[in-house]
Amino acid sequence: MPASTITVFFATNRNPIGDPPTDFGPLLGPIDGTAIRFGTAEIDEKTLKLRKLEVAPEKLVFDDPTDKTLVLGSQQVFDALKAKMIDHARDTLIYVHGFGYSFTEALVRAAEFKKWLAVQMNIFVFTWPSDGKMVPLMSYPKDRADVERSGDAMARAIEIAARYLQKIATDDRCEQRLNILAHSMGNYALRYGVQGLLRRYHSTLPRLFDKVILAAADEDADTFEFDAKLKPLAQLAQQVLVYHTPRDRALIVSDLTKGNPDRLGAGGPDNTRSLNDKVSVVDVSEALSGDDDATNHQYYRVNTRVRADLRQVFGDIVPFQVKGRLYLP
């Protein structure tokens, strides 16, 4: 594709629209949301509009007994992703979006983040069936329920990626790394993805990620204290970073109006002294002016100081040496 587009790889457990699919909707897909479709999208770099969507063909059911050729969409997409990782020596970032995104909006937001972050990496989106409506008291409970039911699908998408990479011959295996960034309710999705992996691997989780970024997390503040939440995340990653601010108005609403416990993305994690050494906590309050985002919930992509911080993180600067931070041991 021309240089004027941004390639976004995706996996989704949303309901497909059309056969073959030309879009995906706000509902759980086949097999109670456990079936996953893979594909790629091209987003116009200037206008940030979807220019092209390709859903990888998938054939798991044999209508013709004489033709039992298995077609896996994941194989096609990961072949393309692997080629980019090797040819361009780029890491890959898996992005998990938050509440209120349609399928297309999730793809565009991922491309926008890659453009604004200005780090050379591949972008891969896991897009769960958020309904694309910002109606908190109506859409929020539905999205939250769908997140819980999407955990196995997310775990399967991660497992498929890991299994595929493990099959690559040693001399072909690329040295580039996988990172993950979850925003807002995407952190709740990540919790259930981690639990899905636990059911598969039991207590011995594989190291799948280099860095995991939890931004403005709509997740419980005690999440690192329980195996049933995100405590096992440290086993999956080399480094876990929590970005938070008590000034996050969206999470204040989540806390006060929806009966949720204290939010990780607002006050940060409970009991920071007992955190795994891999977990770093970054309070972004001093970087916020309110001019970029009135809710103080989208700072990971719109705030220049936070983006500069993330660029250093992806550039392998260790936490206590990141410029612009006041380090509190």
Where are these regions (language model features)?
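Beta-hairpin (beta-strand-turn-beta-strand) motif
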Residues: 98-99, 128
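Gly/Ala-rich beta-loop-alpha elbow adjacent to hydrolase catalytic centers
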Residues: 154, 182-186, 190
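The conserved beta1-alpha1 loop
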Residues: 94-98, 183-184, 216
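Short substrate-entry loop that stabilizes the transition state in hydrolases
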Residues: 101-106
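Active-site- or binding-pocket-proximal scaffold segments within functional domains
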Residues: 66-68, 72
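Alpha/beta-hydrolase fold active-site loops
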Residues: 91
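A short, well-structured juxtamembrane/interface segment
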Residues: 72-86
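Lipolytic serine-hydrolase domain surface
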Residues: 1-66, 85-87, 107-111, 117-122, ...
